């Protein structure tokens, strides 16, 4: 039986002033529902998820030691989201630490260090090989010069949704990497969008509680992205029954950031209610 509440979603999206891309998938039935799935959006921090997958793939191949520690020079620091630029200069982090910071706190400096290590060209080749045909990395995080030149990072709801759907099934690269990416995403601190109006397992819960939620709870592995008048969130949801579904919702050219955030919150809520009915 189809669970995705399409009519309610169309009604809600019709009230949103701005652009939207939406992907919803039900792992149990294979049903996929999209709205403007191939519409390009500035990726914001969503692009950090496939970058994490590539880092883990490189580590599995023996090309990177995740335990190796590095420090980020002060002259390479950028602002925006994250914590590293507020810490003592010269502090060292392992690549393992960097990847957690990149996702859970959306740390731009951790992300840029990982991009430098992997290489932009190789990252884009990985995206193409992984089937992310509309996802491109043209600059590092908060690269003001690149932005002034018109270079930006792009993706679509379908690229991000299919990526997470593949991971939810344990099929992205392999089951180990799929689960490792989701385990990092389950530690997410930013939960004001997709998880906000549903009984999500809290971010401070143990990993086991997040992987096997109690009755009445839902585990969420999500990653947000935002710029002024642009609000995104993507996530894998797991009910206590074990049933999984995916939502990737991207918005831009909004009347207000609140409108985008509120729309994401409400889409997530009506999808959750439908899957629990």
Residue ranges and their predicted role:
Residues 18-40:
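Short, conserved catalytic-motif segment at the N-terminal edge
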Residues 5-20, 25, 87-89, 96-99, ...:
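Penicillin-recognizing serine hydrolase domain
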Residues 98-106:
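Short helix- or helix-capping micro-motifs
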Residues 30, 42-70, 102, 247:
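Active-site SXXK
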Residues 37-41, 85-88:
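Short glycine-enriched, charge-decorated loop/helix-capping segments at active-site entrances
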Residues 52-56, 112, 161:
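Short, hydrophobic alpha-helix immediately C-terminal to the catalytic nucleophile
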Residues 61-87:
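Short, glycine/proline-biased beta-turn/loop segments that scaffold the active-site neighborhood
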């Amino acid at each position: 039986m189809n669970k995705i509440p399409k009519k309610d979603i169309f009604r809600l999206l019709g009230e949103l002033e701005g652009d939207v891309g939406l992907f919803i998938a039900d792992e149990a039935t294979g049903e996929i529902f999209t709205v403007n799935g191939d519409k390009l959006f500035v990726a914001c921090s969503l692009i950090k998820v496939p970058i994490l997958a590539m880092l883990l793939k490189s580590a599995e191949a023996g090309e990177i030691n995740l335990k190796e520690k590095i420090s980020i020079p002060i002259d390479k620091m950028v602002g925006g989201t994250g914590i590293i630029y507020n810490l003592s200069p010269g502090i060292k982090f392992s690549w393992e630490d960097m990847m957690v910071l990149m996702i859970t706190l959306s740390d731009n400096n951790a992300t840029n260090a990982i991009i430098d290590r992997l290489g932009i060209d190789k990252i884009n080749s990985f995206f193409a090989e992984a089937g992310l045909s509309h996802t491109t990395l043209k600059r590092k995080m908060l690269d003001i010069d690149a932005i002034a030149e018109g270079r930006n990072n792009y993706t679509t709801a379908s690229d991000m949704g299919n990526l997470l759907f593949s991971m939810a099934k344990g099929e992205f690269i392999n089951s180990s990497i799929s689960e490792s990416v989701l385990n990092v995403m389950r530690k997410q601190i930013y939960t004001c969008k997709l998880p906000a109006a549903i009984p999500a397992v809290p971010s401070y819960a143990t990993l086991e509680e997040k992987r096997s939620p109690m009755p009445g709870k839902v585990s969420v592995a999500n990653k947000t992205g935002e710029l002024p008048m642009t609000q995104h969130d993507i996530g894998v949801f797991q009910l206590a029954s074990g049933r999984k579904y995916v939502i990737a919702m991207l918005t831009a050219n909004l009347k207000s950031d609140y409108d985008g955030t509120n729309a994401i919150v409400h889409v997530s809520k009506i999808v959750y209610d439908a899957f629990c009915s």
